[in-house]
């Protein structure tokens, strides 16, 4: 057996085929948020090509599938500027199907009233209006894209969204495909050294009896089992950590919806050696159990 260059190839050696990237076509009504959607996907780690002529879809898909290129997720923003563009886009999608490339189509839409208002606010004509009114251009575009909208995998009506809300919606639709989930830092600290400025959430655990006053525990830290058991067995400590963990869950969900990548939760005690350390370790353990990417940091441990 020979390779593409005519050289003999060992038939026992399997040549890995190039892995085709996931392909998403972003199209829809002008002014409905195609570019905003593309930018949101870029933030999620997609490789985005904006305003690509439809006839370039097939060559681009082939290029990114070549060995050595690492573009696992490709999004292409395509608009329809006339009957020719629409025919080229439908033809390109059909050609991709014959090559066993099955792109998803995301169609952006909005009401006529909203689209008119958006074009008027930026003082730009609709690409299909010509010498007519904006609403006439919108009507022409709707007639051209009706079939494409019907075959779309996802249709998003952006009428009630601003730019940030649309970006958040796109992120929620594709959040399982993100390169990074929300990453949480759980920190312990001592109040006598100051409250950490970068913590979104600060919990004061000085209500727990201080192991410092227990001779056997004083030289140990909250990372040691005897201290951790002492702290977690204290009256109110178990209830506190249960409720605190539960209160953070909807907060973290909200952060993910807002595309926030990092969060810091801090526990403080007097010196940052016993109680705060034990509680930080416990919350970190629970978050890991729930699949949350987390690191535990003890800011002031060892300062005494």
UniProtKB/Swiss-Prot annotation:
Disulfide bonds: none
Molecular-function GO terms, alphabetical: ATP binding; GTP binding
Domain of life: Bacteria
Keyword vocabulary terms for this entry: ATP-binding, GTP-binding, Nucleotide-binding
Residues involved in GTP binding: 79-82
Pfam families: PapZ_C, RapZ-like_N
PANTHER family registered for this protein in UniProt: RNASE ADAPTER PROTEIN RAPZ
Family the entry assigns: Belongs to the RapZ-like family.
Role this protein plays: Displays ATPase and GTPase activities.
The protein's name: Nucleotide-binding protein Krad_2934
Organism: Kineococcus radiotolerans (strain ATCC BAA-149 / DSM 14245 / SRS30216)
